[in-house]
Amino acid sequence: MAAVLALRVVAGLAAAALVAMLLEHYGLAGQPSPLPRPAPPRRPHPAPGPGDSNIFWGLQISDIHLSRFRDPGRAVDLEKFCSETIDIIQPALVLATGDLTDAKTKEQLGSRQHEVEWQTYQGILKKTRVMEKTKWLDIKGNHDAFNIPSLDSIKNYYRKYSAVRRDGSFHYVHSTPFGNYSFICVDATVNPGPKRPYNFFGILDKKKMEELLLLAKESSRSNHTIWFGHFTTSTILSPSPGIRSIMSSAIAYLCGHLHTLGGLMPVLHTRHFQGTLELEVGDWKDNRRYRIFAFDHDLFSFADLIFGKWPVVLITNPKSLLYSCGEHEPLERLLHSTHIRVLAFSLSSITSVTVKIDGVHLGQAVHVSGPIFVLKWNPRNYSSGTHNIEVIVQDSAGRSKSVHHIFSVQENNHLSFDPLASFILRTDHYIMARVLFVLIVLSQLTILIIFRYRGYPELKEPSGFINLTSFSLHVLSKINIFYYSVLLLTLYTVLGPWFFGEIIDGKFGCCFSFGIFVNGHFLQGSITFIIGILQLAFFNIPLMAYMCWSLLQRCFGHNFRSHLHQRKYLKIMPVHLLMLLLYIWQVYSCYFLYATYGTLAFLFSPLRTWLTLLTPVLIRYVWTLNSTKFGIFMVQLKSHLSS
């Protein structure tokens, strides 16, 4: 009965925790409503034609990571980008979406704002006069906010050396003869900014959300709105209704931050349920990626590019079906268009722009002005199904570039985004991590409590893996020193401070699983839950399993020396080696804590340093505990084996 009662209590706690998290995230009432989005009126004209009007283009660059210690080529290539690339493409504006500097220490573990990195960045902007050529909108990323106690701190070099030089979200309007286009910056950087890795997620509090809601309302009269920020929406903590809801009237959200997951996901694009595109651009740091985007007769197109690769080609009409959305743009203009339209740029003059549809040669596009090339077509010839358009551009130096995409002149056709990319960008990872963390903890506690209050085991069936595992859990749970050690470790991982130290240089604080207290502020937990999951999965639970296995060996009548002489090395040694590797991982986590947060954090870290020191003591106690403590278990096991 006690075991059933304990199970019900734990299950009830788990259900309550899940419901609380869902209510906190989605809310029930009293939250600001997202902007209303009435059905857009039909606007077939002006349709894309032979002229050079109703079009402008811009660039996005992200995660530059200028470093005083690593890869000086980042700065060299950025200077070339700000001179050569900008001069050739001549964008109306450039969005530099965060992590302008690296802000790491020499060994790449710690974090510190280096003024010389910011001076290098500003020096490039001034030397190339890029701010005289285009509107350069640079915003902060999490690296630009590392180790900054407040926005007014002298360490906040963004205020001194950037082009924008102002903290917080803002609204920039690009005015043209054919309408206004809004660009809204989302500043989700953490204030105060802790050292790495505890500011990987961005945070928008209620005040920031209200500011963004006002900016969204300001942009309602613009032809189009693009939101841009450093963090993906999946790595931003925001109260209900959530950042995605507030930006739902925008055609796209342009961001960086994830570095294409180290190259594992070179294309991180998706569409949210409200219709807004989310487009993460690859990093400049290692991959020298950037993006060109354009509005052509209010149809949005873009292409992700590699620096130094020419020609640069963007098909603006017909636009890609994958990135089309009738709720946000006048797709009917495609059906009424008279010309295929292409933007083509290169170091040398463009000599030919060849167009093919479904593999059929359609002709050579004619140069209109600047980078604009057009070719007359009849879209009604392609009124059914989907079609593939290919454009091949050559310049006078012999360079060639071929681009293609699928299009449709029917508005009811759709293509699906990569499911993994959609999962990465559309999932609130801090909520998933929080739920998973709670479930792991509750599962471990449930097992401990059930075996604690169940009766002594009766081994009736053959001693297979499951029976012996159950038996060892009984042993662990019914010997007080081991039961309370594991119980305390699990509860402490959830509730106790992991370490105390300088969260920011000169500012002391405590780190918990649910967040960080520093300098009078509370930073809500996000990456802390992921670190907590790693701690549970790679040390706490394996330690519990290793103790169970060792206690089982004791019940067989062995001590540490005798169990090594069983001549079962292939079964015994892998267990010890695996635990040794996990212990080394725990030791490394102590070193990482020392390198990132200093000596004080290293010394006052119960979950890292203290646990690392106490683990050998606990394991030694397992192997040296008086055999009389195992009396009833040894008798029962030997009786079962003999029978």
From Swiss-Prot:
It is found in: Membrane. The chain crosses the membrane at residues 3-23, 431-451, 481-501, 527-547, 572-592, 599-619. CDD domains: MPP_TMEM62_N. Pfam families: Ig_TMM62, Metallophos, TMEM62_C. It comes from Homo sapiens. This is Transmembrane protein 62. InterPro entries: Calcineurin-like_PHP_ApaH, Ig_TMM62, Metallo-depent_PP-like, MPP_TMEM62, TMEM62_C. It comes from the Eukaryota. Keywords: Glycoprotein, Membrane, Transmembrane, Transmembrane helix. Glycans are attached at N180, N467, N626. GO terms for molecular function: hydrolase activity. It is a multi-pass membrane protein. Its main location: membrane. The gene is TMEM62. GO terms for cellular component: membrane. The keyword Secreted does not apply. The lineage of its organism: Eukaryota, Metazoa, Chordata, Craniata, Vertebrata.
